Design a protein with these regions (language model features):
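Acceptor-substrate binding/catalytic loop of class I
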Residues: 173, 203-225
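Core SAM-dependent methyltransferase catalytic element
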Residues: 230-236, 240, 245-273
C-alpha cells in the first residue's frame, strides 16, 4: 500500500488565500447531514455514459475534497490530484493514509454507492468502495490555472477526463480571468476527452466562517458560450439547488441556502476530436 506524503509548503501558496483552513472549509461545505450532493450524482451519471474503463483522469483544483474524485474512481483507471494550495493536498493525503485525524467521507461514499445502483450499502460496501478510490490515485501535482499549462507543458492534452469543481469560479472576481482559467483547464484534455465540473451560480463571493473569498459571478449562459466556442459537443448544463441539510430539504427551495448563493451549475461535455 502506498503511503502518501505531501509536505505542507506554505511559502509558495497564494497570499490571497493565506487564511485558508481546509478543515473549516470541509466542515462548512461538506456536513454529514445533507439530502443530496448533486455533483456526486452528476459524476455517477456521466462517468458511466462518457468514459471508457481505461481512462486517465485528473482533478484540477481538487481542494481538500475527496467525494468528487472518489465518485469518478469507478469509471477510470488512473487518477491524478492537483491543487494550488499544498495544505489541501496534505489534507487528502491524510485520507489516503487513513490517518486518525482524516476527514470522514463515509456518508458521501454511502451516497455515491446509492447513485451507482446499490440500494442499501453496508459498512463493508463503503470500506470496499473507499479502497477502490484509494487504489486509483497515481500521484499529486501542484497546479496553477492562471498558467497556459496549469500542471506543466508535458501534461497538455494528456487526459481522457478532466474534473474541476468550483475551482476557476472561486478564485477571482473577474469573469475574463475565469474564462482564461477555464481554457487552461480544458487544455489538459485529449481530443474526445470529457470535462466534468460544477460552479457556483450567480455568486460574487463565498464565506468560510466570517472570511470572504472571491467568486466570478458566472451562470449557465457563460458556460454554454465558453464550451461551445472551445469545441465541446454533447454539452450538459443543469441548474440545481446546492446540497441542503436533511431537516431543511423541504423548505430550502424557497429560501437561500446561504447569503452568497443557493444554486450550482452541473457541467459535462465532450471535446470534439
Amino acid at each position: 500500500m502506498n503511503t502518501w506524503n505531501y509536505e505542507m509548503r506554505t511559502e509558495k501558496d497564494s497570499k490571497e488565500f493565506n487564511t485558508w483552513n481546509p478543515v473549516a472549509y470541509l466542515e462548512e461545505y461538506f456536513p454529514r447531514d445533507v439530502d443530496i450532493e448533486p455533483v456526486v450524482k452528476l459524476i455517477a451519471e456521466e462517468g458511466i455514459k462518457r468514459l471508457r474503463p481505461n481512462a486517465k483522469a485528473i482533478d484540477v483544483g481538487c481542494g481538500p475534497t475527496v467525494c468528487y474524485w472518489s465518485a469518478l474512481a469507478s469509471h477510470v483507471q488512473e487518477l491524478y490530484l492537483s491543487d494550488y494550495l499544498t495544505i489541501n493536498l496534505a489534507q487528502i493525503a491524510k485520507w489516503l493514509n487513513r490517518e486518525s485525524d482524516m476527514y470522514d467521507w463515509s456518508y458521501y461514499t454511502d451516497m455515491m454507492l446509492k447513485f451507482e445502483g446499490l440500494e442499501n450499502p453496508s459498512q463493508q460496501d463503503i470500506i470496499k468502495r473507499e479502497m477502490l478510490s484509494r487504489s486509483k490515485i497515481k500521484g499529486f501535482m501542484r497546479c496553477d490555472i492562471s498558467l497556459e499549462n496549469p500542471v506543466g507543458v508535458s501534461q497538455r492534452g494528456e487526459y481522457d477526463c478532466v474534473l474541476s469543481v468550483c475551482c476557476a469560479d472561486s478564485i477571482t472576481y473577474n469573469k475574463e480571468d475565469w474564462r482564461k482559467y477555464m481554457k487552461n483547464i480544458f487544455s489538459l484534455l485529449k481530443p474526445d476527452g470529457v470535462f466534468l465540473g460544477s460552479s457556483m451560480r450567480n455568486c460574487t463571493h463565498y464565506k468560510i466562517g466570517d472570511i470572504s473569498y472571491p467568486a466570478a459571478n458566472v451562470n449557465e449562459d457563460d458556460f454554454k458560450e465558453l464550451m461551445s466556442d472551445y469545441g465541446f459537443k454533447d454539452i450538459r448544463i443543469d441548474v440545481v439547488y446546492e446540497s441542503r441539510p436533511i431537516v431543511d430539504s423541504q423548505i430550502r427551495k424557497t429560501e437561500d441556502l446561504r447569503g452568497e448563493y443557493d444554486q450550482v451549475l452541473l457541467i459535462a461535455g465532450t471535446l470534439q476530436g
